[in-house]
Swiss-Prot record:
Signal peptide annotation: none
Organism of provenance: Syntrophobacter fumaroxidans (strain DSM 10017 / MPOB)
Name of this chain's protein: Glucose-6-phosphate isomerase
Keywords: Cytoplasm, Gluconeogenesis, Glycolysis, Isomerase
CC per GO annotation: cytosol
Catalytic reactions of this protein: alpha-D-glucose 6-phosphate = beta-D-fructose 6-phosphate
Enzyme Commission number(s) from the entry: 5.3.1.9
UniProt family annotation: Belongs to the GPI family.
Record-linked HAMAP family: G6P_isomerase
């Protein structure tokens, strides 16, 4: 099990607090000037991925102290506890083994003394057979036509993960097959999607472990009603709906053939489920070989994380850097900035991954934490963000550590687009690190021929303090294998931070209260009586809503 230890009471935390006093005003310009080998010293290569963390407000002593904290809180034991199937998700009494889903070795993985790999591989085999039938056109709809559109209906991890991967790997998409994703219970989402579809050639994948998720099942029933309006016979549902679930009775009641039900297990958390049967839409979108490459890339990062010494361990290093800013510099958010349009959903995916995992205020012993935990995660693809929020990162009053991600090779190498894109990628991290001081600004304005009055008026607005931290993650090309490694890298970073912060990263009780209250409010919306059972604001809003609807 994971240790229950307040990190603020450790010797390592005290040493870092003292060290922060010597580092808080050190400028990265000086760190680079003092160390010509800083890039080599603070970067790590992993296959086709290069992680450069040299543009951070740290030195070798900082890194050693952070590594010491990781050792002191028992991180190594925590990593082994996860990989060996201990029930580290204590509040739900579950193991955490999404790593088993992408275990491409012959090694067994045990939960409660039972090797789960035969079941994992059996589901993978079933996914392979099904995806090949769909892609080849051998899976026919009720009218004998092959599938041309797949609609994944899910929410949270059952939507964000597959959608992000399908978008990232669109260059590998199977020809003649389009994949759509519906998640929001707002009827607009399903209605606008259905407008694009032909019921004779559409396959729906209903992704809900229990087959009771309100948003998912509401959308699923709307999709079924639309389908039956055209197809007529409920027997045709079996050719156009499959289930990613564990509830056989509810799947059958919906009209889906249990043979077309793809199972997963309670040791797979929703936000880590894209590696499971929840990834069936991905296997159909990019082909099963591509899905296996995705798993392989993640497995390789799993091995790196489990086996590599912490000082050369990418997820550990990234996690420790995040703790340095979150808990000592007081940074409240982190930006994820991919310079690849295919990765436009990558920040949103890890917004969920990070904030749902580490957005906790109770420690593992049941007390309230005394330190900051999970950061706010946000971002947009470059160069869009440069013309939106980079102003704040460069010259605002908030410290926003940022990860910049980019491929050396584009899937669409047209003209000089990619060179321009990457020139911005390199320029932004340099500008954020170096900045531009008063003397440089004044000299630049003088070269422009500005008057001394104009110079004195303008220079304060054109100064860039710099010293803004970034990690640069450069990879050769966005392939399924590389993407798998990148996703696993961030997953493990999140886990490491949760271990150090003494919180449980694999539950999500914060989503429950709103659902409970919504279940109570829903029947109140369907009658004409004045509502008075809530606080005055909620009562007023509900009654205004009912009045507006007539």
């Amino acid at each position: 099990m994971l240790r229950k230890q307040d990190p603020m009471k450790t010797a390592g935390w005290k040493k870092l607090s003292d060290h922060f006093q010597t580092m808080k005003d050190v400028h990265m310009r000086d760190l680079f000037a003092e160390d010509g080998d800083r890039f080599q010293r603070f970067s790590i290569r992993f296959g086709d991925i290069l992680v450069d963390y040299s543009k951070n407000r740290l030195n070798q002593e900082t890194l050693l102290l952070l590594l010491g904290l990781a050792e002191e809180v028992g991180l190594k034991d925590g990593v082994e506890a996860m990989f060996t199937g201990e029930r580290i998700n204590e509040t739900e009494d579950r193991a955490v083994l999404h790593t088993a889903l992408r275990n491409r070795s012959d090694a067994p993985v045990f939960v409660d003394g039972r090797d789960v790999m035969p079941e994992v591989n059996a589901v993978l085999k079933k996914m392979e057979e099904f995806s090949r039938r769909v892609i080849s056109g051998r899976w026919k709809g009720y009218s004998g036509k092959p599938v041309r559109d797949i609609v994944n209906i899910g929410i949270g991890g059952s939507d964000l993960g597959p959608k992000m991967v399908a978008e990232c790997l669109r260059p590998y998409a199977a020809k003649g097959l389009s994949v759509h994703f519906v998640s929001n219970v707002d009827g607009t989402h399903i209605v606008e999607t259905l407008k694009l579809l032909d019921p004779e050639t559409t396959l729906f994948m209903i992704a809900s472990k229990t087959f009771t998720t309100q948003e998912t099942m509401t959308n699923a029933h709307t999709a079924r009603d639309w389908f039956l309006k055209h197809a007529g016979d409920p027997a045709h549902i079996a050719r156009h709906f499959v289930a990613l679930s564990t509830n056989t009775d509810r799947v059958k009641a919906f009209g889906i053939d249990p043979e077309n039900m793809f199972v997963f297990w309670d040791w797979v958390g929703g936000r880590y489920s894209l590696w499971s049967a929840i990834g069936l839409s991905v296997a159909c979108a990019i082909g099963f070989e591509g899905f296996l490459d995705l798993l392989q890339g993640a497995h390789e990062m799993d091995r790196h994380f489990r086996e590599e010494p912490f000082e050369r361990n990418i997820p550990v290093i990234l996690a420790l850097i995040g703790i340095w800013y979150n808990n000592f510099f007081g940074a409240e958010s982190e930006a994820v900035l991919p310079y690849d349009q295919y990765m436009h959903r990558f920040p949103a995916y890890f917004q969920q991954g990070n904030m749902e995992s580490n957005g906790k205020s109770a420690d593992r012993g049941g007390g309230r934490v005394r330190h900051q935990t999970g950061p706010i995660i946000w971002g947009e693809p470059g160069t869009n963000g440069q013309h939106a929020f980079y102003q704040l990162i460069h010259q605002g009053t908030k410290l926003v550590p940022a990860d910049f991600l980019a491929p050396a090779l584009s899937h669409n190498d047209v003209g000089d687009h990619h060179a321009i894109l990457l020139s911005n990628f390199f320029a932004q991290t340099e500008a954020l690190m170096r900045g531009k001081n008063r003397e440089e600004v004044i000299e630049e304005l003088r070269r422009e021929g500005r008057s001394e009055d104009a110079i004195q008026r303008l220079w304060p607005h054109k100064v860039f303090e710099g010293n803004k931290p970034t990690n640069s993650i450069l990879f050769r090309k966005l392939t399924p294998r590389v993407l798998g490694s990148l996703i696993a890298m961030y997953e493990h970073k999140i886990f490491v931070q949760g271990v150090i912060w003494n919180i449980f990263s694999f539950d999500q009780w914060g989503v429950e209260l709103g659902k409970q209250l919504a279940a109570r409010i829903l029947p109140e919306l369907n009658d004409r009586t004045t509502v008075a059972a809530h606080d005055s604001s909620t009562n007023g809003l509900i009654n205004a809503y009912k009045q507006m609807r007539g």
